[in-house]
């Protein structure tokens, strides 16, 4: 496994890419309300990227065995776990949707993040799922420092999630990122402390847990080749940040003016 350690210049470029990715989510946030379609959300995201001078990393993206992805964003509604394709179905009160944005800057750096959105008044269970998934992401992030392991991140997320009656999707994970969309290492959201790759200053990767209200099993929906849903049709939520390992801890880079407030137990976005 070859992990790319980023230089100070690389990290400076990634801060820009990550801020721009977060600002796409800021741009679309006021528009996400009952009646909007995910296709319109996708159009707004593309509009913002054009204004920034970035491009979408997802549109046309085609890893081996997959068809080209058709959207500028991923929009995963309710029981869709990830890779939901934007469509013309209006969102309604009570829906939850994850919007996942990855941009590429003119100089070839990637920034990747996602947020959950609650459409109108949602059920207590839906609100709880989104909030706990947000907290789980941050608990994972807080484990990051030189000398810690990937297993520390996964264990923190898994222990918290399962302790609150949620299940952790295991088939999808966080990933290294830089001048490629997906680099080593893979960041599992479950695991045992003290196991796996030891973290080093300059590593850059995403933490992006997917948690389900029901069981963890998932399946591919239909024949589009992308959309993943919970097998038991239970709600699923995901939050995502890109971060860099610093000399003493971590720095979350996918932050902007509209980023959600930190959980009460988090006092800083870098340490």
Identify the residue ranges that each predicted region occupies.
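Active-site neighborhoods and metal-handling regions in enzymes and metal-associated proteins
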Residues: 1-271
